[in-house]
Curated annotation (Swiss-Prot):
It is an enzyme of class 3 (hydrolase). This is Dual specificity phosphatase 29. The lineage of its organism: Eukaryota, Metazoa, Chordata, Craniata, Vertebrata. The keyword Metal-binding does not apply. Residues 1-15 have a biased composition (Polar residues). Keywords: Cytoplasm, Hydrolase, Nucleus, Protein phosphatase. It is found in: Cytoplasm; Nucleus.
Length: 220
């Protein structure tokens, strides 16, 4: 396959990737979004920002960072962080926990996950997303989501949050995060995010159909 053919196939794969929003429904746009494959998704990450520092803001008041950021209590306090989600919680990973921040005004949530393609991180998608959402519901809050490198586990949980609570497709979420930080979940996590994407897209389409049927019923 030539490079030109790759570009064309990728363009076709996600050129129609759109958020399934009521506005689009009203405007009559065709909902033809299809979850891209792992290779196409990885290309989206590669096209993102080369920026990779200890911590980056990827959504208002939502930051992805590394172990060094999480361990630096002074800088966390100075920067005004109020919540920490550790996606590498545990003795053999980033061993912090609530006690580590006990004398600080920080709420902690730990996810004991390994950065392995075989690890099922999806069971933590909704609890982690709920923690992030509660944090961001307060205008004065600021949350750090971290793992060891701030590239795979933490990025996966942030992507899941944007998909679940901000009604983004996986493509939307990747583009939002990748433009602000160089991240790349492992293939296993990408597969789990693809499954979440398919489920959420189906739910939104069902909801839109039901809303449309109810609207038609009121007009009769």
């Amino acid at each position: 396959m030539t490079s030109g053919e790759v570009k064309t196939s990728l363009k076709n794969a996600y050129s129609s990737a759109k958020r399934l929003s009521p506005k689009m429904e009203e405007e009559g746009e065709e909902e033809d979004y299809c979850t891209p494959g792992a290779f196409e998704l990885e290309r989206l990450f590669w096209k993102g920002s080369p920026q990779y520092t200890h911590v980056n803001e990827v959504w208002p008041k939502l930051y992805i960072g590394d172990e060094a950021t999480a361990l630096d209590r002074y800088r966390l306090q100075k920067a005004g962080f109020t919540h920490v989600l550790n996606a590498a919680h545990g003795r053999w990973n980033v061993d912090t926990g609530p006690d580590y921040y006990r004398d600080m005004d920080i709420q902690y949530h730990g996810v004991e996950a390994d950065d392995l393609p075989t690890f099922d991180l999806s069971v933590f998608f909704y609890p982690a997303a709920a923690f992030i959402d509660r944090a961001l519901s307060d205008d004065h809050s600021k949350i750090l989501v971290h793992c060891v490198m701030g590239r795979s586990r933490s990025a996966t949980l942030v992507l899941a949050y944007l998909m679940i609570h901000k009604d983004m497709t996986l493509v939307d979420a990747i583009q939002q995060v990748a433009k602000n930080r160089c991240v790349l979940p492992n293939r296993g996590f990408l597969k789990q995010l693809r499954e979440l994407d398919k489920q959420l897209v189906q739910q939104r389409r069902r909801s839109q159909r039901q809303d449309g049927e109810e609207e038609d019923g009121r007009e009769l």
